[in-house]
Amino acid sequence: MSSREAYVDKIKAKIDAWNADIEKMQAKAKEAEADARVNYEEQISEMKAQRDEAEKKMKEARDASESAWSDMRAGFESAWDSISDSFGKAMKRFQ
């Protein structure tokens, strides 16, 4: 398995975990009072945006040639770290 394939697999696994987290938050939002529900919905929207950005980066990495991947890897990793950090911050607001 190439480093690019391993990277894509890692991102896919994280996105799957995020999807599960989003589903949990949506269930909590349905049970929340009206004021709290608005806050949940805002956070869920932010989390979905981060997930969508991660999916976009995963597709770019998957579609890149091996030579292009070598040149793009540092940029992808930096973007991934930023997306992951933002998602984590949104999740912490619920705890």
Question: Where do the PLM segments sit?
Answer:
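Amphipathic alpha-helical membrane/lipid-surface binding segments
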Residues: 4-94
